Amino acid sequence: MALLEICCYSMECALTAQQNGADRVELCAAPKEGGLTPSLGVLKSVRQRVTIPVHPIIRPRGGDFCYSDGEFAAILEDVRTVRELGFPGLVTGVLDVDGNVDMPRMEKIMAAAGPLAVTFHRAFDMCANPLYTLNNLAELGIARVLTSGQKSDALQGLSKIMELIAHRDAPIIMAGAGVRAENLHHFLDAGVLEVHSSAGAWQASPMRYRNQGLSMSSDEHADEYSRYIVDGAAVAEMKGIIERHQAK
């Protein structure tokens, strides 16, 4: 049966995902940045309360995946922290200036991660040569690759995802970006074994007083009185689709 991973941005969201049938959580901060390293407090609270596997993302900033020496030092420290806290896996990725996997840096990450299952995230979708990159990731011992097939969403990239799945000795290929209940059957019918979804919604802030003339964001149009949450009903619906597909 296909595995359902849900991207979560808080302990509460991780618990919601777990309660509604998620098989694994990718734990992140900063949804508008596409996911950054969670705080130590969030990591500890999730580790204590969530019982399904949780893989934190290790990404120090938004934007590209070519990092300064200081940023890379922070990545290694965060990898060590996640390992020490007892998480079973993590999610990360580093590219060089030419859009290839930065092999020397990824080798250091793999050494720091030790026995943890490492997912190479959607930095893969920004690489110059996906099949060459897939070979490099297999050589590193990467457990899985999260990808949209190098398109803006995974449904558009499904043909590339299928090509990657068919590649000999490839890591597990996990489809992600725009995967939701209404299109999930396309991925299941194609033989995708792991799917990644935010199953998310924006929830209004409980604050009654709102200073509408002030923004804490560099984006003056950002709605600071809404929060990104996991929609438990959406998770349960996706899990049900997977179970029914398996029973066919």
Curated annotation (Swiss-Prot):
The keyword Cytoplasm applies. Disulfide bonds: none annotated. One of its GO terms (cellular component) is cytoplasm. It is found in: Cytoplasm. Pfam families: CutC. Keywords: Cytoplasm. The keyword Cytoplasm applies. One of its GO terms (molecular function) is copper ion binding. Signal peptide: none annotated. Gene3D superfamilies: Copper homeostasis (CutC) domain. PANTHER family: COPPER HOMEOSTASIS PROTEIN CUTC (PTHR12598), COPPER HOMEOSTASIS PROTEIN CUTC HOMOLOG (PTHR12598:SF0). Belongs to the CutC family. HAMAP family: CutC. NCBIfam families: PRK11572.1. Homodimer. This is PF03932 family protein CutC. It comes from Shigella flexneri. The gene is cutC.
